[in-house]
Amino acid sequence: MKVGIIGASGYTGSELLRILANHPEAEVIAASSRRYEGQKIWKVHRFLKGFYDLEFCSPELSNFGDCDLVFTAVPHGEAMKYVPQLLDSGIKVVDISADYRLDKETYERVYGKKHEGYVEAVYGLTELHREEIKKANLVANPGCYPTGTILAASPLAKLELIERVVFDCKSGITGAGESPSAFTHYPNLHESIVPYKITEHRHYYEMVQELGRFQSDIKISFTPQVYPGSRGILTNAHVFLRGELTREELYRIYEEFYEDSFFVRIQESVSLSQVRGSNFCDISIHPGEDRVVVVSAIDNLVKGASGQAVQNMNLMMGFDETLGLRTPPLFP
């Protein structure tokens, strides 16, 4: 299977290259970067020396014509320039940008941008939409925060047990992207945790969309924060239930919901160090007097982005969804 990556020089693109380097069925034949066009991949991503001798190309679609599937790992507003033409050429697409995660009207309102060439996609949270993904030509890879939050709350939302849920999320700095800024500057983040886009983060609308499929009247609050680490998203989901459930009942609900999901592990406790560098989402459940706290941990670059994209690629191309991804986390 021949694959391409449009936008391969950033963190998400380089993580795709890392994962695909050892995929037994995938060969990367084209990887684009406007900034590094003509340079060897390993000269830009030095950790990949010995794995790729390919040069970065331009994002012109002629460079991707021989691909069976293309990943678009570009900023929102850019993927829509490529996706319709790729689909028209018979090439399947996993879009890692935000361009196809929401319906057209919501996207234009939330992102403040007219959506040119809108095509309906399958939302690529694999554990929720596995069968639809198998038949899809276009999969919209979820955002990193929605991956951790939706997986944390879905088992209870499916049973319509949630009165309201408060998502308190902390993300590593790679979630802000590769481009340096005052926000990501070392002195501003060192020994600090910084909340941002409070009540305004665009990922909120993915949570509403997906959890609303289970429970239309669910009430959601979401506060993202950045901590001075490179990878990982820890979500504390404060779930206020309709009725009471014992610890045993809660764990049974989660274990049954995810019994066929290799990459979701129900644990007694979780931490970011237990999932680093892997495609796992670890979840623990902690009932209290007035709420249940569900904690989820993911690597934002893997399960929160490139790993889940490869998981979706596997299903789209008829492979086992774990192919090339059965890698234990890095520990310590």
From Swiss-Prot:
Belongs to the NAGSA dehydrogenase family. Type 1 subfamily. One of its GO terms (molecular function) is NAD binding. It is found in: Cytoplasm. CDD domains: AGPR_1_C, AGPR_1_N. Keywords: Amino-acid biosynthesis, Arginine biosynthesis, Cytoplasm, NADP, Oxidoreductase. GO terms for biological process: L-arginine biosynthetic process. The active site is at residue 144. It catalyses: N-acetyl-L-glutamate 5-semialdehyde + phosphate + NADP(+) = N-acetyl-L-glutamyl 5-phosphate + NADPH + H(+). SMART domains: Semialdhyde_dh (SM00859). The gene is argC. Catalyzes the NADPH-dependent reduction of N-acetyl-5-glutamyl phosphate to yield N-acetyl-L-glutamate 5-semialdehyde. GO terms for cellular component: cytoplasm. Its EC number is 1.2.1.38. The keyword S-adenosyl-L-methionine does not apply. This is N-acetyl-gamma-glutamyl-phosphate reductase. The keyword ATP-binding does not apply. Pathway: Amino-acid biosynthesis; L-arginine biosynthesis; N(2)-acetyl-L-ornithine from L-glutamate: step 3/4. PANTHER family: N-ACETYL-GAMMA-GLUTAMYL-PHOSPHATE REDUCTASE, CHLOROPLASTIC-RELATED (PTHR32338:SF10), N-ACETYL-GAMMA-GLUTAMYL-PHOSPHATE REDUCTASE, CHLOROPLASTIC-RELATED-RELATED (PTHR32338). It holds the Pfam family Semialdhyde_dh. Its main location: cytoplasm.
